[in-house]
Amino acid sequence: MIVCDTGPIVSAINKGEKRRHLFAAELLARLGRKVVVPWPVLVETDLLRRSRGFPSAAIVFGESMATGVHRLESPNVADLELALKLGKRYVDSGADLPDLIVMAMAHHRKAQILTWDFRHFRSVVLKRGHHWPLLVSEAEIPIP
């Protein structure tokens, strides 16, 4: 199981990112239903696409989630509590609620994380010495 953050989804949708788009699209297609998209990530992706003038891309992504391309899951109360606890502890990190929910859901499901947001996912930790299990490293992601 892999919990997905917004960045890889946006790259998979945005052909303008060229090599990064191909990398993300191929990776997400290959992983299919192993990928869990938290509801906050679906909402953030929709808002980003629409705010940047791509409402049709937002609709297509929403429809793909409705047909089960990836697994759409809601955070539970324990996920929200952990996300809020991390958000309070790392208030100055810049991590937003969708990031924190991805972390919490991955922790509770013992899942890997797919993100491009390495700064936030490295600065927010459960405890000293903890590292989130990231599916890809910065070095693996092509420059757009």
What are these regions (language model features)?
Residues M1-V37, R50-E63, R128, E140-P144:
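Short, well-structured N-terminal submotif of metal-dependent ribonuclease cores
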Residues C4, V36-V37, S74, L97, ...:
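Short beta-strand scaffold positions
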Residues L31-V35, V69-R71, H108-Q112:
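Short active-site oxyanion
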Residues V41, D79, I101-V102, R119-F121:
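Alpha-helix capping/helix-boundary segments
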Residues V43-D46, L84:
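Amphipathic alpha-helical segments within well-ordered protein domains
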Residues V69-Y90:
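Acidic catalytic patch
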Residues L72, M103, R109-P144:
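Acidic, PIN/NYN-like endoribonuclease modules and their adjacent C-terminal/linker elements
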